[in-house]
Amino acid sequence: MSSILPFTPPVVKRLLGWKKSAGGSGGAGGGEQNGQEEKWCEKAVKSLVKKLKKTGRLDELEKAITTQNCNTKCVTIPSTCSEIWGLSTPNTIDQWDTTGLYSFSEQTRSLDGRLQVSHRKGLPHVIYCRLWRWPDLHSHHELKAIENCEYAFNLKKDEVCVNPYHYQRVETPVLPPVLVPRHTEILTELPPLDDYTHSIPENTNFPAGIEPQSNYIPETPPPGYISEDGETSDQQLNQSMDTGSPAELSPTTLSPVNHSLDLQPVTYSEPAFWCSIAYYELNQRVGETFHASQPSLTVDGFTDPSNSERFCLGLLSNVNRNATVEMTRRHIGRGVRLYYIGGEVFAECLSDSAIFVQSPNCNQRYGWHPATVCKIPPGCNLKIFNNQGFAALLAQSVNQGFEAVYQLTRMCTIRMSFVKGWGAEYRRQTVTSTPCWIELHLNGPLQWLDKVLTQMGSPSVRCSSMS
Protein backbone atom coordinates (compact mmCIF):
# COMPACT_ATOMS: atom_id res chain seq x y z
CA MET A 1 0.00 0.00 0.00
CA SER A 2 1.48 3.33 -1.03
CA SER A 3 1.93 5.98 1.59
CA ILE A 4 -0.98 8.40 1.62
CA LEU A 5 0.41 10.71 4.26
CA PRO A 6 4.02 11.96 4.48
CA PHE A 7 4.96 9.27 6.98
CA THR A 8 3.10 6.11 7.93
CA PRO A 9 4.54 4.19 10.90
CA PRO A 10 5.05 0.45 10.31
CA VAL A 11 2.47 -0.51 12.95
CA VAL A 12 -0.14 1.64 11.21
CA LYS A 13 0.69 -0.03 7.89
CA ARG A 14 0.32 -3.45 9.49
CA LEU A 15 -3.05 -2.58 11.03
CA LEU A 16 -4.30 -1.06 7.78
CA GLY A 17 -3.35 -4.30 6.05
CA TRP A 18 -6.11 -6.01 8.03
CA LYS A 19 -8.75 -3.46 7.02
CA LYS A 20 -11.89 -4.99 5.54
CA SER A 21 -12.99 -3.64 2.17
CA ALA A 22 -16.64 -2.98 1.38
CA GLY A 23 -17.94 -5.56 -1.08
CA GLY A 24 -14.52 -5.99 -2.60
CA SER A 25 -14.94 -2.64 -4.33
CA GLY A 26 -11.87 -1.05 -5.81
CA GLY A 27 -10.08 -0.34 -9.04
CA ALA A 28 -11.61 1.94 -11.64
CA GLY A 29 -14.53 4.15 -10.81
CA GLY A 30 -14.94 6.15 -7.64
CA GLY A 31 -11.18 6.49 -7.40
CA GLU A 32 -11.25 9.89 -5.76
CA GLN A 33 -13.84 8.79 -3.22
CA ASN A 34 -11.90 5.61 -2.46
CA GLY A 35 -8.75 7.67 -2.05
CA GLN A 36 -10.45 9.96 0.44
CA GLU A 37 -11.75 6.95 2.33
CA GLU A 38 -8.28 5.39 2.46
CA LYS A 39 -6.84 8.63 3.74
CA TRP A 40 -9.52 8.89 6.43
CA CYS A 41 -8.95 5.29 7.54
CA GLU A 42 -5.22 5.95 7.87
CA LYS A 43 -5.88 9.01 10.01
CA ALA A 44 -8.31 7.05 12.20
CA VAL A 45 -5.77 4.27 12.76
CA LYS A 46 -2.95 6.76 13.41
CA SER A 47 -5.05 8.53 16.02
CA LEU A 48 -5.87 5.26 17.76
CA VAL A 49 -2.26 4.04 17.68
CA LYS A 50 -1.04 7.29 19.18
CA LYS A 51 -3.46 6.96 22.07
CA LEU A 52 -2.82 3.27 22.71
CA LYS A 53 0.95 3.73 22.78
CA LYS A 54 0.50 5.87 25.88
CA THR A 55 -1.44 3.13 27.68
CA GLY A 56 0.51 0.10 26.47
CA ARG A 57 -2.57 -1.49 24.86
CA LEU A 58 -1.34 -1.34 21.27
CA ASP A 59 0.09 -4.88 21.30
CA GLU A 60 -3.26 -6.23 22.51
CA LEU A 61 -5.08 -4.50 19.65
CA GLU A 62 -2.68 -5.94 17.09
CA LYS A 63 -2.99 -9.38 18.67
CA ALA A 64 -6.80 -9.24 18.52
CA ILE A 65 -6.86 -8.15 14.88
CA THR A 66 -4.20 -10.55 13.59
CA THR A 67 -5.54 -13.59 15.47
CA GLN A 68 -9.20 -12.57 15.10
CA ASN A 69 -9.67 -13.90 18.61
CA CYS A 70 -12.44 -12.76 20.97
CA ASN A 71 -10.51 -14.13 23.95
CA THR A 72 -8.13 -11.18 23.86
CA LYS A 73 -8.18 -8.40 26.44
CA CYS A 74 -10.12 -5.15 26.29
CA VAL A 75 -8.49 -2.36 24.29
CA THR A 76 -9.77 0.86 25.81
CA ILE A 77 -9.72 4.58 25.19
CA PRO A 78 -11.48 7.32 27.18
CA SER A 79 -15.20 7.33 26.41
CA THR A 80 -15.15 11.14 26.18
CA CYS A 81 -12.20 11.35 23.85
CA SER A 82 -13.36 13.91 21.31
CA GLU A 83 -10.66 16.15 22.77
CA ILE A 84 -8.00 13.65 21.71
CA TRP A 85 -8.34 14.37 18.05
CA GLY A 86 -8.03 18.16 18.23
CA LEU A 87 -9.82 18.67 14.94
CA SER A 88 -12.28 21.36 14.00
CA THR A 89 -16.02 20.93 14.36
CA PRO A 90 -17.86 20.52 11.04
CA ASN A 91 -20.11 23.34 9.96
CA THR A 92 -22.22 21.71 7.27
CA ILE A 93 -24.23 18.52 7.02
CA ASP A 94 -21.92 17.19 4.31
CA GLN A 95 -19.01 17.10 6.75
CA TRP A 96 -20.80 15.00 9.33
CA ASP A 97 -20.76 11.24 9.59
CA THR A 98 -23.95 10.77 11.57
CA THR A 99 -23.74 6.99 11.48
CA GLY A 100 -23.97 5.76 15.04
CA LEU A 101 -24.80 9.22 16.33
CA TYR A 102 -24.49 9.46 20.08
CA SER A 103 -24.93 12.46 22.36
CA PHE A 104 -24.49 12.87 26.08
CA SER A 105 -27.03 14.82 28.10
CA GLU A 106 -26.01 18.45 28.57
CA GLN A 107 -26.46 18.04 32.29
CA THR A 108 -23.94 15.20 32.54
CA ARG A 109 -21.27 15.83 29.93
CA SER A 110 -20.18 18.64 27.67
CA LEU A 111 -18.54 16.33 25.13
CA ASP A 112 -20.66 14.23 22.82
CA GLY A 113 -18.82 10.95 23.25
CA ARG A 114 -17.94 10.53 19.60
CA LEU A 115 -14.57 10.44 17.92
CA GLN A 116 -13.90 13.07 15.33
CA VAL A 117 -11.39 12.31 12.61
CA SER A 118 -11.02 14.72 9.69
CA HIS A 119 -14.44 16.27 10.10
CA ARG A 120 -16.21 12.93 10.49
CA LYS A 121 -17.64 11.78 13.76
CA GLY A 122 -18.71 8.38 14.96
CA LEU A 123 -18.82 6.18 18.02
CA PRO A 124 -15.34 4.74 18.61
CA HIS A 125 -16.34 1.07 18.74
CA VAL A 126 -18.49 1.50 15.62
CA ILE A 127 -15.63 3.17 13.72
CA TYR A 128 -13.14 0.41 14.43
CA CYS A 129 -15.61 -2.47 14.06
CA ARG A 130 -16.44 -1.07 10.64
CA LEU A 131 -12.76 -0.70 9.82
CA TRP A 132 -11.61 -4.18 10.82
CA ARG A 133 -14.71 -6.37 10.67
CA TRP A 134 -17.91 -5.10 9.02
CA PRO A 135 -17.55 -2.36 6.37
CA ASP A 136 -21.34 -2.29 5.96
CA LEU A 137 -21.96 -1.46 9.63
CA HIS A 138 -24.41 1.41 9.99
CA SER A 139 -25.12 1.90 13.68
CA HIS A 140 -24.31 0.88 17.22
CA HIS A 141 -27.75 -0.76 17.27
CA GLU A 142 -26.22 -3.48 15.09
CA LEU A 143 -23.60 -4.38 17.70
CA LYS A 144 -23.66 -6.15 21.02
CA ALA A 145 -20.68 -6.79 23.26
CA ILE A 146 -19.47 -10.26 24.17
CA GLU A 147 -20.02 -11.31 27.78
CA ASN A 148 -16.42 -11.03 28.94
CA CYS A 149 -15.93 -7.45 27.66
CA GLU A 150 -15.38 -5.37 30.79
CA TYR A 151 -15.52 -1.98 29.07
CA ALA A 152 -18.32 -2.53 26.58
CA PHE A 153 -19.95 0.58 25.15
CA ASN A 154 -23.27 -0.15 26.84
CA LEU A 155 -21.69 -0.22 30.32
CA LYS A 156 -21.13 3.55 30.13
CA LYS A 157 -17.76 3.47 31.87
CA ASP A 158 -15.12 6.18 31.64
CA GLU A 159 -13.21 3.91 29.27
CA VAL A 160 -14.76 2.20 26.24
CA CYS A 161 -13.45 -0.95 24.58
CA VAL A 162 -12.65 -0.63 20.88
CA ASN A 163 -11.43 -4.21 20.41
CA PRO A 164 -13.43 -5.16 17.29
CA TYR A 165 -13.49 -8.81 18.38
CA HIS A 166 -15.25 -7.90 21.62
CA TYR A 167 -18.41 -7.09 19.66
CA GLN A 168 -20.84 -9.24 17.72
CA ARG A 169 -23.25 -8.37 14.96
CA VAL A 170 -26.90 -8.44 16.04
CA GLU A 171 -28.78 -11.08 14.09
CA THR A 172 -32.34 -10.60 12.88
CA PRO A 173 -34.52 -13.17 14.67
CA VAL A 174 -36.43 -15.60 12.49
CA LEU A 175 -40.16 -15.09 12.95
CA PRO A 176 -42.23 -18.27 13.34
CA PRO A 177 -44.85 -18.85 10.65
CA VAL A 178 -48.47 -18.08 11.45
CA LEU A 179 -50.78 -21.08 11.19
CA VAL A 180 -53.88 -20.11 9.25
CA PRO A 181 -56.92 -22.30 8.45
CA ARG A 182 -57.08 -23.09 4.74
CA HIS A 183 -59.86 -21.10 3.09
CA THR A 184 -61.17 -21.09 -0.45
CA GLU A 185 -63.59 -18.16 -0.33
CA ILE A 186 -62.66 -15.13 -2.39
CA LEU A 187 -62.51 -11.86 -0.50
CA THR A 188 -64.87 -9.35 -2.10
CA GLU A 189 -65.22 -6.69 0.58
CA LEU A 190 -62.93 -5.57 3.37
CA PRO A 191 -64.22 -4.58 6.80
CA PRO A 192 -63.68 -0.95 7.80
CA LEU A 193 -60.59 -0.14 9.80
CA ASP A 194 -60.86 1.62 13.13
CA ASP A 195 -60.21 5.17 11.98
CA TYR A 196 -58.50 7.55 14.40
CA THR A 197 -57.63 10.08 11.71
CA HIS A 198 -60.35 12.53 12.68
CA SER A 199 -60.29 11.91 16.43
CA ILE A 200 -58.13 14.01 18.74
CA PRO A 201 -55.21 11.82 19.85
CA GLU A 202 -53.78 11.83 23.33
CA ASN A 203 -50.26 13.13 23.90
CA THR A 204 -47.36 11.78 25.87
CA ASN A 205 -43.81 12.94 26.40
CA PHE A 206 -40.78 10.77 25.76
CA PRO A 207 -41.44 7.77 28.07
CA ALA A 208 -39.88 8.25 31.48
CA GLY A 209 -38.64 4.68 31.42
CA ILE A 210 -36.79 5.15 28.15
CA GLU A 211 -33.46 6.80 28.57
CA PRO A 212 -32.32 9.42 26.06
CA GLN A 213 -29.46 8.83 23.69
CA SER A 214 -27.09 10.03 26.40
CA ASN A 215 -27.51 6.70 28.12
CA TYR A 216 -27.35 3.06 27.13
CA ILE A 217 -29.82 1.92 24.52
CA PRO A 218 -30.22 -1.80 25.16
CA GLU A 219 -28.86 -4.25 22.68
CA THR A 220 -31.30 -6.25 20.65
CA PRO A 221 -31.70 -9.52 22.56
CA PRO A 222 -31.31 -12.96 21.04
CA PRO A 223 -34.16 -14.58 19.10
CA GLY A 224 -37.11 -15.68 21.21
CA TYR A 225 -36.94 -12.74 23.58
CA ILE A 226 -38.95 -9.65 22.77
CA SER A 227 -37.05 -6.68 24.09
CA GLU A 228 -38.22 -3.54 25.76
CA ASP A 229 -36.31 -0.30 26.24
CA GLY A 230 -35.16 -0.94 29.81
CA GLU A 231 -35.87 -3.68 32.34
CA THR A 232 -36.79 -1.55 35.35
CA SER A 233 -38.73 0.97 33.32
CA ASP A 234 -40.85 -1.77 31.76
CA GLN A 235 -41.74 -3.10 35.17
CA GLN A 236 -42.77 0.36 36.30
CA LEU A 237 -44.79 0.94 33.13
CA ASN A 238 -46.58 -2.37 33.40
CA GLN A 239 -47.35 -1.83 37.07
CA SER A 240 -48.69 1.66 36.56
CA MET A 241 -50.73 0.87 33.45
CA ASP A 242 -51.70 -2.70 34.34
CA THR A 243 -52.02 -3.60 30.69
CA GLY A 244 -50.87 -6.51 28.60
CA SER A 245 -47.84 -6.18 26.39
CA PRO A 246 -46.95 -7.91 23.17
CA ALA A 247 -43.77 -8.92 24.94
CA GLU A 248 -45.92 -11.20 27.09
CA LEU A 249 -47.29 -13.01 24.05
CA SER A 250 -45.66 -15.85 22.21
CA PRO A 251 -46.91 -17.38 18.98
CA THR A 252 -46.38 -20.82 20.50
CA THR A 253 -48.26 -20.14 23.74
CA LEU A 254 -51.38 -18.39 22.52
CA SER A 255 -54.90 -19.79 22.71
CA PRO A 256 -55.13 -23.31 21.32
CA VAL A 257 -55.97 -23.83 17.67
CA ASN A 258 -58.49 -26.39 16.47
CA HIS A 259 -56.11 -28.89 14.91
CA SER A 260 -58.95 -30.57 13.07
CA LEU A 261 -58.75 -27.63 10.67
CA ASP A 262 -56.48 -27.76 7.67
CA LEU A 263 -53.82 -25.30 8.84
CA GLN A 264 -51.43 -23.65 6.44
CA PRO A 265 -48.21 -21.97 7.65
CA VAL A 266 -47.82 -18.43 6.35
CA THR A 267 -44.22 -17.26 6.67
CA TYR A 268 -42.70 -13.81 6.93
CA SER A 269 -40.32 -12.78 4.17
CA GLU A 270 -38.13 -9.70 4.10
CA PRO A 271 -38.98 -7.37 1.19
CA ALA A 272 -36.42 -5.53 -0.93
CA PHE A 273 -37.63 -2.22 0.54
CA TRP A 274 -38.39 -2.46 4.24
CA CYS A 275 -40.46 0.74 4.32
CA SER A 276 -41.98 3.40 2.09
CA ILE A 277 -42.04 7.05 3.18
CA ALA A 278 -44.41 9.72 1.92
CA TYR A 279 -43.94 13.41 2.77
CA TYR A 280 -46.86 15.76 3.44
CA GLU A 281 -47.36 19.47 4.05
CA LEU A 282 -50.63 19.92 5.90
CA ASN A 283 -53.07 17.68 4.00
CA GLN A 284 -51.17 17.70 0.71
CA ARG A 285 -48.82 14.98 -0.46
CA VAL A 286 -45.54 16.45 -1.76
CA GLY A 287 -42.98 14.68 -3.93
CA GLU A 288 -42.50 11.02 -4.72
CA THR A 289 -42.56 8.12 -2.29
CA PHE A 290 -39.15 7.20 -0.87
CA HIS A 291 -38.45 3.45 -0.80
CA ALA A 292 -35.96 2.43 1.88
CA SER A 293 -33.60 -0.43 1.06
CA GLN A 294 -30.86 0.36 3.59
CA PRO A 295 -31.17 -0.51 7.31
CA SER A 296 -30.28 3.06 8.28
CA LEU A 297 -31.54 6.23 6.65
CA THR A 298 -32.10 9.89 7.46
CA VAL A 299 -35.00 12.14 6.55
CA ASP A 300 -33.70 15.72 6.74
CA GLY A 301 -34.50 19.23 5.59
CA PHE A 302 -31.43 19.82 3.46
CA THR A 303 -31.23 20.31 -0.29
CA ASP A 304 -28.75 17.58 -1.20
CA PRO A 305 -29.91 14.97 -3.73
CA SER A 306 -31.58 12.01 -2.06
CA ASN A 307 -29.92 8.60 -2.16
CA SER A 308 -30.57 5.14 -0.74
CA GLU A 309 -29.60 6.27 2.77
CA ARG A 310 -31.02 9.77 2.72
CA PHE A 311 -34.39 11.38 1.94
CA CYS A 312 -33.84 15.14 1.61
CA LEU A 313 -36.99 17.25 1.88
CA GLY A 314 -35.35 20.58 1.10
CA LEU A 315 -35.52 20.19 -2.68
CA LEU A 316 -39.22 19.29 -2.79
CA SER A 317 -41.41 22.07 -4.19
CA ASN A 318 -45.04 22.87 -3.48
CA VAL A 319 -46.88 25.79 -5.11
CA ASN A 320 -49.38 25.81 -2.23
CA ARG A 321 -46.72 26.15 0.49
CA ASN A 322 -47.54 28.87 3.03
CA ALA A 323 -45.33 30.87 5.41
CA THR A 324 -45.88 28.50 8.34
CA VAL A 325 -44.74 25.52 6.30
CA GLU A 326 -41.73 27.47 5.01
CA MET A 327 -40.68 28.39 8.54
CA THR A 328 -41.14 24.83 9.79
CA ARG A 329 -39.07 23.41 6.93
CA ARG A 330 -36.18 25.67 7.94
CA HIS A 331 -36.17 24.07 11.39
CA ILE A 332 -36.24 20.42 10.27
CA GLY A 333 -32.44 20.54 9.98
CA ARG A 334 -30.86 17.12 10.39
CA GLY A 335 -34.30 15.63 10.90
CA VAL A 336 -34.71 12.02 11.97
CA ARG A 337 -32.66 8.87 11.52
CA LEU A 338 -34.57 5.62 11.09
CA TYR A 339 -32.96 2.27 11.83
CA TYR A 340 -34.26 -1.18 10.92
CA ILE A 341 -32.04 -3.48 12.94
CA GLY A 342 -32.71 -6.99 14.23
CA GLY A 343 -36.40 -6.84 13.38
CA GLU A 344 -36.88 -3.58 15.26
CA VAL A 345 -37.43 -0.04 13.98
CA PHE A 346 -35.95 2.91 15.87
CA ALA A 347 -36.49 6.63 15.36
CA GLU A 348 -33.72 8.97 16.52
CA CYS A 349 -34.23 12.72 16.62
CA LEU A 350 -31.20 14.42 15.03
CA SER A 351 -32.92 17.78 14.70
CA ASP A 352 -32.59 20.65 17.16
CA SER A 353 -36.39 20.53 17.41
CA ALA A 354 -38.48 17.63 18.68
CA ILE A 355 -40.23 15.14 16.44
CA PHE A 356 -43.66 13.71 17.19
CA VAL A 357 -44.48 10.07 16.50
CA GLN A 358 -47.76 8.18 16.28
CA SER A 359 -46.94 4.47 16.29
CA PRO A 360 -49.79 2.09 17.18
CA ASN A 361 -47.27 -0.72 17.74
CA CYS A 362 -45.28 1.36 20.23
CA ASN A 363 -48.48 2.60 21.87
CA GLN A 364 -49.74 -0.95 22.30
CA ARG A 365 -46.49 -1.97 23.94
CA TYR A 366 -46.88 0.73 26.59
CA GLY A 367 -50.62 0.35 27.03
CA TRP A 368 -51.45 3.73 25.54
CA HIS A 369 -54.38 4.56 23.29
CA PRO A 370 -53.54 3.47 19.72
CA ALA A 371 -53.61 7.07 18.46
CA THR A 372 -51.32 8.52 21.15
CA VAL A 373 -48.65 10.90 19.84
CA CYS A 374 -45.25 10.68 21.56
CA LYS A 375 -42.82 13.60 21.62
CA ILE A 376 -39.19 12.62 21.03
CA PRO A 377 -36.78 15.39 22.12
CA PRO A 378 -33.52 16.14 20.30
CA GLY A 379 -30.85 13.50 20.85
CA CYS A 380 -33.32 10.85 21.96
CA ASN A 381 -34.25 7.55 20.42
CA LEU A 382 -37.44 5.46 20.56
CA LYS A 383 -38.27 1.97 19.37
CA ILE A 384 -41.33 2.46 17.18
CA PHE A 385 -41.91 -1.05 15.87
CA ASN A 386 -41.03 -4.60 16.89
CA ASN A 387 -41.45 -7.47 14.43
CA GLN A 388 -41.60 -10.15 17.12
CA GLY A 389 -44.29 -8.31 19.04
CA PHE A 390 -46.25 -7.88 15.82
CA ALA A 391 -45.85 -11.59 15.02
CA ALA A 392 -47.29 -12.51 18.42
CA LEU A 393 -50.26 -10.20 17.91
CA LEU A 394 -50.84 -11.59 14.43
CA ALA A 395 -50.83 -15.18 15.68
CA GLN A 396 -53.29 -14.23 18.39
CA SER A 397 -55.52 -12.29 15.99
CA VAL A 398 -55.79 -15.23 13.58
CA ASN A 399 -57.62 -17.11 16.31
CA GLN A 400 -60.01 -14.18 16.70
CA GLY A 401 -61.03 -14.04 13.07
CA PHE A 402 -60.58 -12.12 9.86
CA GLU A 403 -61.59 -8.69 11.17
CA ALA A 404 -59.08 -8.88 14.05
CA VAL A 405 -56.28 -9.61 11.59
CA TYR A 406 -57.38 -6.86 9.23
CA GLN A 407 -57.31 -4.30 12.04
CA LEU A 408 -53.56 -4.93 12.40
CA THR A 409 -53.08 -3.09 9.10
CA ARG A 410 -53.10 0.13 11.09
CA MET A 411 -50.12 -1.04 13.13
CA CYS A 412 -47.99 -1.05 10.01
CA THR A 413 -48.36 2.70 9.44
CA ILE A 414 -46.37 5.25 11.46
CA ARG A 415 -46.86 9.00 11.27
CA MET A 416 -44.21 11.48 12.29
CA SER A 417 -44.26 15.29 12.32
CA PHE A 418 -41.31 17.67 12.46
CA VAL A 419 -41.03 20.64 14.83
CA LYS A 420 -44.79 20.99 15.44
CA GLY A 421 -46.82 18.42 17.36
CA TRP A 422 -50.49 17.50 17.25
CA GLY A 423 -53.07 16.09 19.63
CA ALA A 424 -55.18 17.08 22.62
CA GLU A 425 -52.42 19.20 24.17
CA TYR A 426 -51.64 21.12 21.00
CA ARG A 427 -53.37 23.72 18.90
CA ARG A 428 -53.16 21.31 15.98
CA GLN A 429 -55.31 18.30 16.74
CA THR A 430 -54.81 16.19 13.61
CA VAL A 431 -51.63 15.26 11.79
CA THR A 432 -52.94 16.90 8.61
CA SER A 433 -52.87 20.20 10.51
CA THR A 434 -49.11 19.98 11.08
CA PRO A 435 -46.91 21.84 8.57
CA CYS A 436 -44.47 19.02 7.77
CA TRP A 437 -44.95 15.32 8.39
CA ILE A 438 -44.14 11.92 6.97
CA GLU A 439 -45.98 8.61 6.84
CA LEU A 440 -44.10 5.31 6.98
CA HIS A 441 -45.55 2.09 5.61
CA LEU A 442 -43.73 -1.00 6.88
CA ASN A 443 -43.73 -3.26 3.85
CA GLY A 444 -42.71 -6.55 5.47
CA PRO A 445 -45.54 -6.67 8.04
CA LEU A 446 -48.04 -5.34 5.47
CA GLN A 447 -47.15 -8.05 2.96
CA TRP A 448 -47.32 -10.68 5.70
CA LEU A 449 -50.80 -9.47 6.64
CA ASP A 450 -51.85 -9.61 3.01
CA LYS A 451 -50.75 -13.24 2.71
CA VAL A 452 -52.52 -14.19 5.95
CA LEU A 453 -55.74 -12.43 4.92
CA THR A 454 -55.64 -14.10 1.52
CA GLN A 455 -55.26 -17.48 3.19
CA MET A 456 -58.11 -16.76 5.62
CA GLY A 457 -60.51 -15.76 2.85
CA SER A 458 -63.47 -13.45 3.39
CA PRO A 459 -64.84 -12.44 6.81
CA SER A 460 -67.59 -14.60 8.29
CA VAL A 461 -69.95 -11.63 8.51
CA ARG A 462 -69.99 -9.06 5.74
CA CYS A 463 -69.31 -5.53 6.95
CA SER A 464 -71.18 -2.71 5.30
CA SER A 465 -72.49 0.75 6.02
CA MET A 466 -75.68 -0.88 7.31
CA SER A 467 -73.97 -3.21 9.78
Curated annotation (Swiss-Prot):
Ranges annotated as biased composition (Polar residues): 207-217, 233-243
GO cellular component, one term: cytoplasm
Stretches assigned to the MH2 domain: 274-467
Modified residue annotations for Phosphothreonine: 8, 220
Record keywords: Acetylation, Cytoplasm, DNA-binding, Metal-binding, Nucleus, Phosphoprotein, Transcription, Transcription regulation, Ubl conjugation, Zinc
Phosphoserine PTM positions: 240, 245, 250, 255, 458, 460, 464-465, 467
Modified residues (N6-acetyllysine): 19
Binding partners and assembly: Monomer; in the absence of TGF-beta. Heterodimer; in the presence of TGF-beta. Forms a heterodimer with co-SMAD, SMAD4, in the nucleus to form the transactivation complex SMAD2/SMAD4. Found in a complex with SMAD3 and TRIM33 upon addition of TGF-beta. Identified in a complex that contains at least ZNF451, SMAD2, SMAD3 and SMAD4. Interacts (via the MH2 domain) with ZFYVE9; may form trimers with the SMAD4 co-SMAD. Interacts with TAZ/WWRT1. Interacts with FOXH1. Interacts with SNW1. Interacts with CREB-binding protein (CBP) and EP300. Interacts with SNON. Interacts with ALK4/ACVR1B.
Region (Disordered): 207-251
Function field: Receptor-regulated SMAD (R-SMAD) that is an intracellular signal transducer and transcriptional modulator activated by TGF-beta (transforming growth factor) and activin type 1 receptor kinases. Binds the TRE element in the promoter region of many genes that are regulated by TGF-beta and, on formation of the SMAD2/SMAD4 complex, activates transcription. Promotes TGFB1-mediated transcription of odontoblastic differentiation genes in dental papilla cells. Positively regulates PDPK1 kinase activity by stimulating its dissociation from the 14-3-3 protein YWHAQ which acts as a negative regulator.
GO biological process, one term: odontoblast differentiation
Localization, UniProt: Cytoplasm; Nucleus
Motif (PY-motif): 221-225
GO molecular function, one term: I-SMAD binding
Domain of life of the organism encoding this protein: Eukaryota
Gene: SMAD2
Protein name: Mothers against decapentaplegic homolog 2
Record-linked PROSITE patterns: MH1, MH2
Pfam families with a match to the protein in the record: MH1 (PF03165), MH2 (PF03166)
Post-translational modification: In response to TGF-beta, phosphorylated on the C-terminal SXS motif by TGF-beta and activin type 1 receptor kinases, phosphorylation declines progressively in a KMT5A-dependent manner. Phosphorylation in this motif is required for interaction with a number of proteins including SMURF2, SNON and SMAD4 in response to TGF-beta. Dephosphorylated in this motif by PPM1A leading to disruption of the SMAD2/3-SMAD4 complex, nuclear export and termination of the TGF-beta signaling. In response to decorin, the naturally occurring inhibitor of TGF-beta signaling, phosphorylated on Ser-240 by CaMK2.
InterPro entries cross-referenced by the UniProt entry: Dwarfin, MAD_homology1_Dwarfin-type, MAD_homology_MH1, SMAD-like_dom_sf, SMAD_dom_Dwarfin-type, SMAD_FHA_dom_sf, SMAD_MH1_sf
UniProt: Zn(2+) binding residues: 74, 149, 161, 166
